[in-house]
């Protein structure tokens, strides 16, 4: 019954904001089109469609606001005006009762509040749809007296989320079957992505692990501070981390007054982003101004401070390599290389005609590159590329969409601090150095160090595995095993070539050292 009432409310909000016309106009059925005409007869909507959608999501509550925020990152699927409007959604809800927050902390950690903290501020400093944050001072153990931020999960979220997600899945299924653009927009995939995103956010231990990983990655960095995680005070409902002090990155005048070089700060932000993406393959994916502070303490003046680790992105070595090559090809205006990389990486279907994709990419990107480099937005270039990719059935990877959204945030922050920020001038040396390390001799030697022991371990088993496959082939008279054997033989040949190259390299290196010592001995005698 509750679900039925919720559905009725959703339908009412859709009708109130005139979204029925927007939603139903894309359906294939003539009957539905006729229904649209009847329902909208005499109704006039003065607000743009994107604004109406944003207002409807805000009226439906925090879960739908979250959904709109996630949807705003899928610029490969949405019209630009709708995506821009959804990006304005703010995840702000009234705080829940501090007594309930204290009770959750006590139940989750198994101790009274007075045994856990010297002080616990009952007035929350931040409140969102998933959790709210209180400041406190730890009691007991080696961290006694440390100032911390306590993030507490909002109670009763799971039933509400599951109910709304069930409705979203039903609507997505209908859309995919009946809507003309249903298959292209992949509504069920979008809802499934949102489902995973929400359930990840409901586990604060996951967020604590993200914070710990990022802190470890930047432990020796002079650019970024990440709060320490206090694991003994962390559960799936409570996340306790070091309290950080700083000025919001968007308050540029206040930062300058404190002696921070905002031009350097803008460049540092770009370097932090590319370091996360290409060095670590793990990046903070929610870098809006509310989640970034800047330290004004004398010992760490001008260092960024990261907060809120609920959304992170990860890239494989494969993705990092192709992404770096794409960026370099973009700024060399080598559109053929960009198109070729899309096909080679599997992002575009194998049957894609490279020349056609190249022409579409040129038409998409050339208007941007006619501007001065300081005015070029890498994030917007990626966004336009995703939109162009619709025509070629290019499968946009979720991690790349997260990266594009984060890059837009980084650029926006950077140009608030320094309007003349040349993103490419800052990023290019980093990318070229990374590519040299990965693809040059150093990268080859590093990979050989990692892979050679594994290859050496596998080689003795190869004859036995080949014999087993041949026996199975003889029994089953199948062809799949032959293909497997061929693949194994190809792998064996490739392994032999790589090992030979490694031995040749090591041998040459050894000969060089011996020759150097011999020449030195001859020179002395």
From Swiss-Prot:
Top-rank EC class of the record's enzyme: transferase
Subcellular location: Cell inner membrane
CDD domains: UbiB
Function comment: Is probably a protein kinase regulator of UbiI activity which is involved in aerobic coenzyme Q (ubiquinone) biosynthesis.
Keyword tags: ATP-binding, Cell inner membrane, Cell membrane, Kinase, Membrane, Nucleotide-binding, Transferase, Transmembrane, Transmembrane helix, Ubiquinone biosynthesis
GO terms (BP aspect): regulation of ubiquinone biosynthetic process; ubiquinone biosynthetic process
Organism this protein belongs to: Ralstonia nicotianae (strain ATCC BAA-1114 / GMI1000)
PANTHER family: CHAPERONE-ACTIVITY OF BC1 COMPLEX CABC1 -RELATED, PROTEIN ACTIVITY OF BC1 COMPLEX KINASE 7, CHLOROPLASTIC
Functional pathway: Cofactor biosynthesis; ubiquinone biosynthesis [regulation]
Bilayer topology annotation: Single-pass membrane protein
Listed name of the protein: Probable protein kinase UbiB
InterPro entries: ABC1_dom (IPR004147), Kinase-like_dom_sf (IPR011009), Prot_kinase_dom (IPR000719), UbiB (IPR010232), UbiB_bact (IPR045308), UbiB_kinase (IPR050154)
